[in-house]
């Protein structure tokens, strides 16, 4: 079973991360994004709901957030609770996490993705 991925963030981070992933791997068709910008929370909420409602629910859905407890996370979590939606929310998104998900779309393991992302952080 393949998965769909929705990135959400403050500012243009989610968009930039999708663009960076595309630069590294090419087609990122199953990755989409919604950004919280200066237009406010209502616009973000509507954009998020539109995206999440139109994602193929026959596949796993992962929502990747920049910050746990931030507005994009809170809106995703609120939607999940209110709609009993079946998607996973992962926080602290980074490029290694996106690459791990991209290369394992057919066999995702949330716990392993988090572990791999943590292991990619080093002091050299």
Identify what each model region corresponds to.
Residues 2-64, 68-124:
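N-terminal loops that bind phosphate or other acidic moieties
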